[in-house]
């Protein structure tokens, strides 16, 4: 009997140590990593890379003891270890990252990254290592949720204040005036902020649907309102694309329960109220607020605000007097699904028609953003067209494993002079997650990277029937993929993504 107790202790002590260290690491990454900056946003890419490298490096070193203990028990047959598909996809991405470094266009940048794109091999190895250790040792804790809410709220408030040309923390002190509208928080560029927000705000929206405590519900309502305000203040199209996908999914799943449906109306109402608040700020502050452009201009028009106010009134009446039986909600979900598929089909036909028949007629209008040409998406079309064309001309080995992490600049360099002449700058990434992964780690890397995400989404969708909170995993990953259509992964969001994938798979594994 004594020997049995000693064996249990031998197993549990390293395991408890691993869980404790992992919890501290998660608190650091969720609570400190997003908000940390050295007093200025100059060189913020390098600062974030160093912060993550040190934090993850120390974490992985400390985790060697519990990992080796756990591995020894698995090797001796005292403990069974199941390798799921997410691990296989992570392994594929790891192989692609390693091989791509060996055949990289610039091996130094492939290993270390460059001054703008810091996601070189070292960072990716730390991300993948974090994923595996978090997946095996993480224990979900309410403290992590609060740390995440506080840190992301700080990011939102920074974005709102700076959009109003009010830098209360003097973060922009060394940034030239022409760039100040772009750098709005300790996460730097507005597009980097959207990538981070896609990993936190959608989860809060789902939590609002599910929560039962009145206090938590009120906190989440305030959090969502501020987060939505920041999305508008970022003035970037990727934020609109991301939140549109979130709402389309949220509405669909909300039909499953009357409480969810009514709370979904509240979330949409908070979104409209946030837009009205931003509109009022734009009227009151006028020139003291950075101007809106592209799709953002639609949300600061009086017609949009009036329409939103009408919808708020309708939602209020629906919540007070609506009679949403289970049968009505089921029919509503069915109609909604059919309508969305029809609209999606019509949208695809519309986009194809614009590109092949009416591209010249819509030039200079908002619809021109749907036409694939050099001017599309603030120059994104330029880099997308050339990226796709050059990738097809690469040697077969590079098509399989890529040109090296951090090497997109070298990949696109043949158009250096042309980019400087047309845009006054050079593209360091393709502003598209798929193209970024494809160029840097090849087809194998694409299968591994997106396989991890899609498998986790599929597992979350399946598990949510028994554990409703997994719906948050599905929607936030969908939101990340949506904004990734216009943005590329960066040092600001990639570590958080891999940690969330590990945390999600850990939680889902514990429910088996």
Residue ranges and their predicted role:
Residues 189, 379-427, 441-445:
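TM-adjacent membrane-interface loops and short helices in multi-pass inner/ER membrane proteins
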Residues 114-118, 158-172, 341, 352-407:
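Aromatic-rich transmembrane-lumenal/periplasmic boundary elements in polytopic membrane proteins
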Residues 109-114, 232-237, 484-491:
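Membrane-interface helix caps and helix-loop-helix hairpins in membrane proteins
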Residues 83-91, 263-269:
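Cytoplasmic-side transmembrane-helix entry/capping segments in multi-pass membrane proteins
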Residues 36-50:
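Short, hydrophobic transmembrane alpha-helix segments
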Residues 10-29, 33-39, 55-67, 98-102, ...:
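Alpha-helical transmembrane segments of multi-pass inner-membrane proteins
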Residues 65-81, 100-112:
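Transmembrane alpha-helix boundary signature
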């Amino acid at each position: 009997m004594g020997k049995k107790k000693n064996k249990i202790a031998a197993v549990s002590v390293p395991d408890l140590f691993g869980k404790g260290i992992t919890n501290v690491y998660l608190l650091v990454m969720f609570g400190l990593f997003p908000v940390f900056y050295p007093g200025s946003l100059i060189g913020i890419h390098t600062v974030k890379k160093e912060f993550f490298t040190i934090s993850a490096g120390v974490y992985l070193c400390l985790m060697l003891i519990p990992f080796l203990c756990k591995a020894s028990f698995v090797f001796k047959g005292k403990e069974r270890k199941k390798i799921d598909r997410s691990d296989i996809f992570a392994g594929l991405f790891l192989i692609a990252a390693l091989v791509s470094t060996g055949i990289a266009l610039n091996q130094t940048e492939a290993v270390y990254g460059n001054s703008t794109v810091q996601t070189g091999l070292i960072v990716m190895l730390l991300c993948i290592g974090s994923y595996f250790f978090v997946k095996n040792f993480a224990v979900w804790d309410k403290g992590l949720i609060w740390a995440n809410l506080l840190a992301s709220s700080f990011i939102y408030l920074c974005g709102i204040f700076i959009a109003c040309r009010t830098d209360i923390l003097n973060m922009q002190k060394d940034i030239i005036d022409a760039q100040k509208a772009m750098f709005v928080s300790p996460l730097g560029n507005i597009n980097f902020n959207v990538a981070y927000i896609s990993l936190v705000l959608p989860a809060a929206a789902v939590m609002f649907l599910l929560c039962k405590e009145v206090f938590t519900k009120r906190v989440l309502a305030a959090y969502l309102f501020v987060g939505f305000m920041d999305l508008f203040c970022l003035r970037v199209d990727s934020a609109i694309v991301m939140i549109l996908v979130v709402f389309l999914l949220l509405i669909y799943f909300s039909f499953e329960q009357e409480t969810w449906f009514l709370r979904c109306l509240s979330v949409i109402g908070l979104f409209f109220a946030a837009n009205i608040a931003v509109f009022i700020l734009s009227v009151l502050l006028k020139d003291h607020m950075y101007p809106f452009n592209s799709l953002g201009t639609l949300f600061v028009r009086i017609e949009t605000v009036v329409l939103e106010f009408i919808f708020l009134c309708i939602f209020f009446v629906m919540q007070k007097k609506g009679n949403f039986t289970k049968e009505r909600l089921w029919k509503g979900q069915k109609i909604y699904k059919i309508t969305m598929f029809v609209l999606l089909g019509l949208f695809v036909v519309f986009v194809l028609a614009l590109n092949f028949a009416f591209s010249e007629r819509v030039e200079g209008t908002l619809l021109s953003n749907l036409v694939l040409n050099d001017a599309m998406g603030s120059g994104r079309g330029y880099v997308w067209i050339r990226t796709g064309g050059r990738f097809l001309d690469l040697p077969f080995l590079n098509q399989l494993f890529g040109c090296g992490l951090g090497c997109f600049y070298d990949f696109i360099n043949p158009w250096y002079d042309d980019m400087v002449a047309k845009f006054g700058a050079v593209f360091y990434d393709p502003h598209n997650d798929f193209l970024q992964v494809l160029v840097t780690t090849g087809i194998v890397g694409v299968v591994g990277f997106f396989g991890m995400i899609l498998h986790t989404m599929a597992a979350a969708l399946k598990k949510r029937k028994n554990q409703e909170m997994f719906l948050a995993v599905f929607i936030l990953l969908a939101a990340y993929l949506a904004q990734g259509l216009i943005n590329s992964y960066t040092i600001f969001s990639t570590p958080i993504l891999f940690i969330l994938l590990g945390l999600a798979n850990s939680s889902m594994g514990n429910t088996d």
